[in-house]
Amino acid sequence: MTRLQILLGAILALFAVSIAAQQSDGLTRQDGKPVQITVYAPPAGDICLGIAIISPGAGGSESGYAYLGQALSSLRYFTVVVGHQESGLQALRQQIQGHSLREGLARLITDPQAYEGRFMDIAAARHWAAQRCNAGEAILLGHSMGAATTMIEAGAKNKLGLSVPDAFDVYIALSPQGSGLIFPVGAWQGISKPLLSITGTKDDELGGGSWETRREPFENMTPGCKWFAVIEGATHMNLAGHGMSRRSQALTTQTIQQFLLALHQGECKPPAPQRGIQILAK
């Protein structure tokens, strides 16, 4: 069984969990549609340092990525995990009708309307969170399709005709995509804000490419607080917080904390080498 088959099987196995975990809050985006969110607030009494918005992968929901929500809230960021109805579980199910899961995912992650919905969801969540923590910086973090969303928000060119204002101060992309279905070669040269990319040595791409394709955005970006981290043995679903992922989760959240600390210190220097993870910086 290939890694891609394992990945696709894991996504199917998570469908029932996603359904059970969904919950609704009272957010409404600019077109009047509801936005489901899960909130992770900083510990009571702590001063909020800023806000963090988390954008799930295709088929994901606001009930996932708890390890990231908990980690960022512990760092005193008012954190919101956003559900995306145009690219959530139900949307993915519709895309795979009459197609394989792999084909359905490819159709969904290249659907411009799905991204437009994501941008509205994120804008609504950002506005709502800023009313509760009107201080510090704004972070956008995304995984998989959420990473593509994050890169486009940060200023990456794309093949889908999408454009959105660069509204965040810091960007974090887990499992970013290289050039292909979504991004042309050289798409990331215009990204100027601090950006952290994280992948794993078992984080294969949907098309079957190895994790090494995920390094392309980092290599293409201009220098200026850009990090690229590779976690030994981490899979695509580990970075989403599933599977035997405790070690991968710990290294992911540790790297995010180190990146934010280095950014605040003004030099953005990477940490000392550590077993199990490699970090490149420029």
Q: Over which residues does each language-model region extend?
A:
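Bacterial N-terminal signal peptides that target proteins for export
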Residues: M1-L8
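N-terminal signal peptide c-region/cleavage motif recognized by signal peptidases
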Residues: A16-S18
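Serine-hydrolase catalytic machinery in alpha/beta-hydrolase-like enzymes
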Residues: S24-N134
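Alpha/beta-hydrolase active-site loop signature
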Residues: G59, H84-G88, G178, D203-D204, ...
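Active-site rim elements
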Residues: I109-Q113, I182-F183, L239-Q249
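Primarily recognizes the serine-hydrolase "nucleophile elbow" in alpha/beta-hydrolase
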Residues: A123-G190
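The feature captures the conserved acid-bearing segment of alpha/beta-hydrolase catalytic domains
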Residues: S163-G233
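Alpha/beta-hydrolase-fold serine-hydrolase catalytic core, especially in secreted/extracellular enzymes
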Residues: G233-A234, A240-K282
